[in-house]
Amino acid sequence: MRNTRVLTGILWVLAGVYAAATYSNMLFALSIPIGAVLLVAVVFSLIHGAMRYHWSGIAAFIVICLVVSNILENTSILTGFPFGHYHYTDSLGPKLFLVPLLIGPAYFANGYLAWALSTVLVGDVRRESSAFTTFAVPFMASFLMVMWDLGFDPQASTIQRFWIWEQGGGYFGVPLTNYLGWFFTVYVFLQLFALFLRVRGAQSLTLARSYHAQAVVMYAVVGLTPVVGYLAAKTNTAVSDGAGGVWHTGSITESMATVTIFTMLFAAALAAVKLLQEPTAAVHKV
């Protein structure tokens, strides 16, 4: 792609804007809309993905991601598979069938970051990739994606009531089936993308070490969100989940921060160490 330096600069700016908007909402009680903050993350993933896979490749990622995630979310709302029994409230705005329109872009933005981090840890998937890499990258990326939801779902559902787990769950009102469903859903669309790249992807591409570092930093910025939320929390009130179980917001926010530090931030640190250890040529060749 042309103008790589310009795009690299734009990506750093987007990461900074995302961090500033997200953290300011919590620290200073601002009211920057969720959609606006999510748009920044979407643009970051879109540009970052296009630099590696070109516009056609990242477009394929988006289509696969949106179709698979919407089908499985709607299926679960209707049947309980694969996430469990839940429903969305009207807090997130208009819906596509039974799922808010904002959910698809969230899958894309965070799913791409998980994919990008996994390629740092395992290797990139391209036309000449081995079968091992083709399956290992989406498998590991699915864990990286679920790490995000571990530090997000109890806050969004039990406290903010964006969606309701109708039978509650042991993890602050969230059931284990939610995380198994997340893993399954993310693995399906990332595996389909990996197979697409194996057939239609380009040959090896030279990218700077800083390119990979941007995805690691953005993933860490997202991971810091529950930590900042915990530090900004000023109240500790009782809330109930969909089954009537009572939880305390202080316990939820502290637990989310603890979990995220030792999952997402650990994964980001591991990827950063991997980048620093790799010879320059090996990092550039993906």
Please name every model-derived segment.
Residues M1-V286:
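Aromatic-rich, lipid-facing transmembrane alpha helices and their immediate juxtamembrane interface loops
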